[in-house]
């Protein structure tokens, strides 16, 4: 405010709100509230949450009165004022009314009795026969119109010098001419969008599953020109943000913070409107909607689904690329580059929703190299999010997009081309991967992600394994590294202790087996290294297929009281040899029945990495036992949460480097410092009690037979050729020309059901709210609209 006296007068007006009862509408206190403040910070600092809570508790009628007065004032100002001077008192008055309402609405929504009053106040049609719309509809129309008010948020247009003119703020989708840009218009748009976000926040304070009446109304406005202009304005403003120099093209650096606020609120309001599917609001709103005898629709998502010019798709892809990729290439200090790291979720949610509503955009995306850029970036970002428990939903969003891309046949086939370093990844940190295809890279990265997440985020691990199932249907020319990663994933997923630690882990094993079967059945002549590698380890697969529930439970029940061989009672995981004896005994039995000797993999002949031959008959007792311990240690080591993002280099680089080191090292993991694993937190269902009935429901459905039929026959031929001294090239030629058993139906996990799509839509909406609330918080230098209020929607998220 301009002076200490003004601040004191405003503060006294706030105190009167909870000290006096029934302040009339014509009292001068209301005028002081909208004339004295100068900035949003003044309103939020001098009208605290504690003050408003006292008003709600001691004089709720004053809170109701101020809402009514502010609504009327904003409507009157729009009708009667020209707004030809940004410094005019009327402009300041309108802005302060918006700031006050932004501050007040969360207090109204968090209280049940106040929400009931607001529902009646906003959505009950007045008894006046000349009025057929409720106050809420009129007010929301007014607020939206402020976004297109001449000389307030847009410049004069031709002969139009005042009033509302629906137009698109920024060049881009649908609109190409450039509009005059002024800083005052940007700041005013921020205030209007912030008010809309506050009005939409009703649903984050509810626990009944119903949405926001205000958001549902705005999304269902049947004015095509308004919807087109607002949707295009929000998209274009967000997509035109030039991050290359960390400032907008038309603003000096000092004003970039204000423009970044506009980007944040454009994204937030856009995502909330796009994802609006819950048309159930408060009782009075529902009555109002039913009285109109029309089914409510989300015209924003409908219009988005009809967007089809390739030029518009190109604009959106260019904008997403600017927002996602350049910050990772930036040479400026990491602390500054993290500014855009906060925006990644907003861009990815938008991408997910756009793909969800517009199939044309998705097909356009996969027809270009941008899809591979996005795919590699998502893998990279997944490792970055892996180390922080607070970014679980960020990781889940990346995995959802990965799964959607790999579910497309044409995209999976494109991954068979040779891998090239991506410009989307940091210049200073190239991926330590060469000599393979994008499919090889993807299998290695996803296998690592599954081993990192399977003990902590089973849902994410399952989705990643589903992606492997789709990819392996079309993957060709897989090299030794990816073949080995796939086998290690099978080892990790088939560990007996892991299978019985809860009631869903077996799904991960089922998906991994499905991925292997898809790879060996549908690209046999192209995947000779994969077939050779698994054939040489077919005894291990047969040993796993011979596991019995009784043997596993006997080990578990023989452990200390209250403990499991896979975890301890205090939730800490340790490496354990308890279950190794089961696999070892099964392997001995399989080897004793095997008609052919075992020949170790010769890395020099077949180009495989120098993997320790841990299953040789000569070292069956010592070697296999050692390998099981090594595999157990590796599993738990990989499951450890990695260090926070700022303390180390990119996690994808780190993970691939470690994986390559392990594959090329003769030493057992237990001979390294990494082998001395400390206890780590572990998500185990301690209430789960495995039963024979539970085991028999899923164990028979695991398709070991397809693998064993192929690998058993192939291993016999490989053994005969090795005994005859045939070179590696002839063995590989035999594998490529071999006639294999008839293929079964491919294993394709079903996920694109109506229920799954609804779950994804709900997740995207909740996540959009979570990110919006986080960006608005004080720690992100936001005004803190929702801080100090009782937000309920994230309790179970």
Curated annotation (Swiss-Prot):
Family: Belongs to the hid-1 family.
Cytoplasm as UniProt keyword: yes
Superkingdom in the source lineage: Eukaryota
Organism: Schizosaccharomyces pombe (strain 972 / ATCC 24843)
Keywords per UniProt: Cytoplasm, Nucleus
Location within or outside the cell: Cytoplasm; Nucleus
InterPro entries per record: Hid-1/Ecm30
Origin organism lineage: Eukaryota, Fungi, Dikarya, Ascomycota, Taphrinomycotina
GO CC aspect terms: cytoplasm; cytosol; Golgi medial cisterna; Golgi trans cisterna; membrane; nucleus
TM helices/strands, residue ranges: none
PANTHER family registered for this protein in UniProt: PROTEIN HID1 (PTHR21575:SF12)
Principal localisation: cytoplasm
Protein name (Swiss-Prot/TrEMBL): Hid-1 family protein P27G11.12
């Amino acid at each position: 405010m301009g002076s200490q006296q003004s601040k004191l007068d405003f503060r006294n007006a706030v105190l009167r709100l909870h000290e006096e009862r029934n302040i009339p509408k014509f009292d001068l206190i209301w005028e002081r509230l909208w004339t004295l403040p100068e900035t949003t910070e003044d309103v939020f600092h001098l009208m605290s949450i504690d003050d408003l809570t006292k008003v709600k508790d001691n004089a709720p009628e004053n809170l109701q009165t101020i809402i009514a007065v502010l609504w009327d004032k904003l409507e009157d100002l729009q009708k009667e004022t020209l707004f030809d001077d940004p410094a005019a008192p009327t402009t300041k008055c309108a802005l302060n009314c918006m700031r006050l309402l932004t501050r007040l609405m969360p207090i109204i929504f968090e209280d049940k009795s106040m929400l009931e009053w607001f529902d009646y106040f906003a959505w009950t049609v007045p008894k006046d026969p000349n009025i057929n719309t409720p106050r809420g509809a009129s007010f929301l129309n007014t607020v939206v119109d402020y976004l297109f008010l001449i000389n307030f948020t847009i410049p004069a247009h031709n002969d139009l010098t005042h009033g509302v003119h629906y137009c698109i703020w920024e060049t881009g989708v649908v609109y190409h001419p450039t509009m005059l840009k002024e800083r005052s218009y940007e700041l005013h748009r921020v205030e209007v969008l912030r008010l809309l976000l506050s009005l939409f926040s009703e649903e984050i304070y509810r626990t009944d599953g119903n949405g926001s009446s205000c958001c549902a109304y705005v999304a269902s406005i049947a004015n095509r020109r308004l919807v087109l202009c607002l949707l295009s304005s929000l998209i274009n403003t967000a997509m035109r943000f030039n991050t290359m120099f960390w400032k907008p093209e038309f603003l000096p650096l000092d004003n970039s913070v204000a423009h970044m606020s506009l980007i944040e609120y454009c994204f937030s309001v856009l995502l909330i409107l796009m994802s609006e599917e819950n048309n159930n609001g408060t009782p009075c709103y529902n009555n109002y909607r039913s009285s109109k005898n029309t089914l409510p629709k989300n015209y924003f998502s409908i219009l988005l689904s009809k967007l089809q010019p390739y030029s518009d798709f190109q604009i959106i892809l260019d904008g997403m690329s600017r927002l996602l990729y350049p910050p990772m290439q930036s040479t400026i200090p990491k602390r500054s580059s993290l500014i855009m790291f906060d925006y990644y979720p907003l861009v990815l949610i938008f991408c997910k929703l756009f793909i969800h509503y517009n199939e044309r955009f998705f097909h356009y995306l996969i027809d270009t190299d941008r899809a591979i850029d996005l795919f590699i970036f998502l893998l990279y970002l997944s490792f970055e999010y892996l180390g922080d428990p607070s970014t679980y939903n960020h990781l889940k969003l990346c995995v959802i997009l990965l799964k959607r891309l790999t579910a497309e046949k044409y995209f999976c086939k494109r991954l068979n081309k040779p891998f090239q370093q991506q410009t989307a990844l940091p210049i200073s940190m190239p991926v330590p991967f060469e000599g393979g295809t994008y499919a090889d890279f993807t299998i290695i990265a996803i296998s690592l992600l599954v081993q990192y997440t399977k003990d902590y985020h089973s849902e994410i691990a399952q989705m990643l394994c589903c992606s492997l199932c789709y990819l392996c249907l079309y993957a060709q020319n897989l090299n030794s590294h990816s073949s080995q990663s796939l086998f290690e994933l099978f080892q990790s997923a088939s560990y007996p202790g892991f299978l019985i630690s809860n009631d869903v882990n077996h799904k991960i094993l089922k998906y991994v087996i499905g991925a292997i079967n898809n790879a060996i059945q549908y690209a046999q002549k192209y995947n000779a290294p994969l077939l050779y590698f698994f054939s040489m380890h077919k005894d291990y697969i047969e040993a796993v297929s011979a596991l019995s529930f009784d043997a596993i439970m006997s080990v578990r029940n023989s452990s200390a009281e209250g403990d499991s061989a896979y975890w301890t009672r205090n939730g800490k995981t340790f490496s354990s040899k308890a279950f190794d004896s089961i696999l070892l005994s099964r392997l001995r039995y399989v080897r004793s029945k095997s008609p052919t000797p075992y020949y170790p993999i010769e890395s020099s002949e077949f180009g495989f990495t120098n993997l320790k031959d841990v299953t040789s008959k000569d070292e069956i007792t010592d070697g296999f036992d050692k390998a099981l311990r090594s595999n157990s240690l590796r599993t738990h080591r990989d499951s450890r949460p990695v260090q926070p993002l700022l303390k180390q280099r990119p996690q994808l680089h780190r993970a691939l480097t470690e994986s390559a080191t392990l594959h090329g090292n003769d030493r057992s993991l237990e001979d390294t410092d990494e082998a001395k694993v400390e206890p780590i937190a572990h998500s185990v269902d301690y209430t789960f009690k495995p039963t024979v009935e539970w085991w028999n429901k899923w164990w028979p459905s695991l398709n070991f037979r397809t693998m064993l039929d192929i690998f058993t026959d192939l291993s016999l031929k490989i053994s005969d050729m090795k005994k005859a001294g045939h070179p590696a090239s002839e063995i590989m030629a035999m594998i490529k020309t071999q006639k294999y058993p008839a293929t079964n139906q491919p294993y394709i996990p079903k996920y694109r059901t109506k229920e799954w799509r609804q779950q994804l839509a709900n997740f995207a909406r909740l996540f959009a709210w979570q990110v919006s609330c986080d960006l608005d918080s004080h720690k992100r230098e936001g005004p803190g609209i929702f801080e100090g209020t009782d937000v309920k929607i994230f309790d179970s998220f």
